[in-house]
Amino acid sequence: MQWLAIGLGAAIGACLRGWLARFNPMHHWIPLGTLGANVLGGLLIGLALVWFERVGSGLSPNIRLFVITGFLGGLTTFSTFSVEVFTFIHNGKLLAGLGLIGLHVGLTLLATALGFYFFKLVL
């Protein structure tokens, strides 16, 4: 049952990531879809951490696997982020690559903290 929960969550997360990828060409040096997927994933994992701690403790562990390992693992995309940064650096756009690293890491950490602390206030 664990593998089914993870697989189903991953499929849904990957479909959302695929939909968000439509926004990648909108800006010439910021792949907005990848950035959006990672920032949204950061926000949602912050919310999920608090929710599972406060509300979801009595739930089946498969639900946590579905949400965190499956859905959020399928949604967020470190490998795509890595190849986008590498492509900039390989094409001589070092500052763009470094800027992209800063955007992804900074915004994702900020979103995680916002989700975490917002849900702590609400629950």
Curated annotation (Swiss-Prot):
Signal peptide: none annotated. It comes from the Bacteria. Na(+) is not transported, but it plays an essential structural role and its presence is essential for fluoride channel function. It is found in: Cell inner membrane. Pfam families: CRCB. InterPro entries: FluC. One of its GO terms (biological process) is cellular detoxification of fluoride. Fluoride-specific ion channel. Important for reducing fluoride concentration in the cell, thus reducing its toxicity. PANTHER family: FLUORIDE EXPORT PROTEIN 1-RELATED. Belongs to the fluoride channel Fluc/FEX (TC 1.A.43) family. This is Fluoride-specific ion channel FluC. It comes from Psychrobacter cryohalolentis (strain ATCC BAA-1226 / DSM 17306 / VKM B-2378 / K5). The lineage of its organism: Bacteria, Pseudomonadati, Pseudomonadota, Gammaproteobacteria, Moraxellales. The gene is fluC.
